[in-house]
């Protein structure tokens, strides 16, 4: 039992570290793009809302 527990702990640790390091290594560019997209969307949303209000009024 203790050996199995050790193996499970090692697997869990590697999984956690893998999931933490993988996005930073592979998707650093993709991550930046998505955050940029989010900020631009947030920046443009007030203008879109005001346009909608103008169209309604």
Swiss-Prot record:
Q: Does the keyword ATP-binding apply?
A: no
A Gene Ontology annotation in the biological process aspect, one of them, is:
establishment of competence for transformation
Q: What happens when the gene is disrupted?
A: Decreases expression from the aprE promoter.
Q: Where is the stretch described as Disordered?
A: 26-57
Report the induction information.
Answer: Part of the rapH-phrH operon, which is transcribed from the SigA-driven rapH promoter. phrH is also transcribed from a putative SigA-driven promoter embedded within the rapH gene sequence.
Q: Does the keyword Cell membrane apply?
A: no
Tell me what happens on changing residue 34 to A: Small decrease in activity
Fill in the PTM field for this protein.
Contains a predicted signal peptide cleavage site in the N-terminal region, however the propeptide is probably only subject to processing events at the ends of the mature peptide.
Which positions correspond to the propeptide?
1-34, 41-57
Q: Which GO terms describe its cellular component?
A: cytoplasm; extracellular region
Compartments, as annotated in UniProt: Secreted; Cytoplasm
Q: Changing residue 41 to A: what effect?
A: Retains 10% of wild-type activity
Primary localization: secreted
Entry keywords, A to Z: Competence, Cytoplasm, Secreted, Sporulation
What does the record say mutating residue 48 to A does? Decrease in activity
Phenotype for residue 54 to A: Decrease in activity
Q: What is the effect of changing residue 33 to A?
A: Small decrease in activity
Question: What does this chain do?
Answer: Signaling molecule involved the regulation of both sporulation and competence. Secreted during production, but the mature peptide acts intracellularly, indicating that it needs to be imported into the cell to function. Acts by inhibiting RapH activity. Can inhibit both RapH activities, the dephosphorylation of Spo0F and the sequestration of ComA.
* Membership in a protein family: Belongs to the Phr family.
Q: What is the protein name stated in its UniProt record? A: Phosphatase RapH inhibitor
**Lineage of the species this protein comes from:** Bacteria, Bacillati, Bacillota, Bacilli, Bacillales
């Amino acid at each position: 039992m203790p050996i199995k527990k050790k193996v499970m702990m090692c697997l869990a640790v590697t999984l956690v570290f893998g999931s933490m390091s993988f996005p930073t290594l592979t998707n650093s560019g993709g991550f930046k793009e998505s955050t940029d997209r989010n900020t631009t969307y947030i920046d443009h949303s007030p203008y879109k809302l005001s346009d909608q209000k103008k169209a309604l009024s």
